[in-house]
């Protein structure tokens, strides 16, 4: 995996096993994405979760994606944000682009939606909730929710040292205050600040 590779050391803030996780650390994310491949619609599910993670998509933004939002020539994705957030164009990494091509190559329809249900309709938010639960269980993870993938994106970017303004734009936040939460990460960021 290249962009937003699942490497690094993000500390989990979850101590109560019954509390829903805010985000997945890199090891958990890798296990989650691998588990997604094993389902009946593994190609679709892996791509869905990879895109939700890398682009910080909400459920409703993921189900609203259309094939025309992907530019294969420019290797970009048009992300239409909801809830008054700022929309924008995101680059798509090579492995993600190949996964999109592979998934579309398996389809035999002319429907505009990027993600389809097994009944050939647009995938629903309810279906994504179910898929997250099933995939989490297969990966040995508990108390996940789809929004956890969006949070995981923010935390992963912050852990890589990406500045807050860039994370704000990537996630489409209107206010920087919404983005600040992602700086609550490992103390590793502070190592060596005064060495020199």
Per-segment meaning from a language model:
Residues 1-196:
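Conserved catalytic core of the tyrosine transesterase superfamily
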């Amino acid at each position: 995996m290249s962009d937003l590779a699942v490497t690094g050391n993000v500390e989990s803030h979850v101590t109560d096993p019954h509390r829903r996780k805010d985000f997945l650390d890199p090891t958990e994310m890798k296990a989650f994405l691998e588990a997604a491949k094993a389902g009946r619609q593994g190609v679709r599910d892996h791509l869905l979760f990879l895109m939700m993670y890398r682009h910080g998509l909400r459920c409703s933004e993921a189900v609203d994606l259309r094939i025309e939002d992907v530019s294969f020539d420019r290797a970009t994705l048009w992300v239409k944000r909801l809830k008054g957030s700022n929309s924008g164009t995101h680059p798509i990494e090579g492995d993600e682009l190949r996964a999109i091509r592979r998934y579309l190559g398996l389809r035999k329809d002319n429907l505009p939606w990027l993600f389809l249900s097994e009944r050939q309709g647009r995938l629903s938010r309810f279906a994504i909730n179910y898929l997250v639960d099933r995939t989490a269980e297969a990966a040995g993870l508990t108390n996940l929710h789809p929004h956890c993938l969006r949070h995981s994106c923010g935390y992963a970017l912050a852990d890589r040292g990406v500045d807050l303004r860039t994370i704000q734009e990537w996630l489409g936040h209107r206010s920087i205050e919404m983005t600040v939460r992602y700086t609550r990460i490992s103390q590793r960021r502070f190592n060596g600040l005064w060495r020199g």
